[in-house]
Amino acid sequence: YKQCHKKGGHCFPKEKICIPPSSDFGKMDCRWRWKCCKKGSG
């Protein structure tokens, strides 16, 4: 998956992706990332 930095593509806004902590006492690792671009017309 590539980040949406290309012009002319149909891209979605950023979404928050949360990754469970490796330890039981850790916090959720949440980061904002770009959704993937869809190919084709729409």
UniProtKB/Swiss-Prot annotation:
Listed InterPro entries: Myo_ane_neurotoxin_sf, Myotoxin
Entry superkingdom: Eukaryota
Transmembrane annotation, as ranges: none
GO annotations of cellular component type: extracellular region
Pfam families membership: Myotoxins
SUPFAM superfamilies: Defensin-like
Localization terms from the record: Secreted
Molecular function terms, GO-annotated: potassium channel regulator activity; toxin activity
Keywords: Antimicrobial, Disulfide bond, Ion channel impairing toxin, Myotoxin, Neurotoxin, Potassium channel impairing toxin, Secreted, Toxin, Voltage-gated potassium channel impairing toxin
Family according to the record: Belongs to the crotamine-myotoxin family.
Name the record gives this protein: Crotamine Ile-19
Organism in which the protein naturally occurs: Crotalus durissus ruruima (South American rattlesnake)
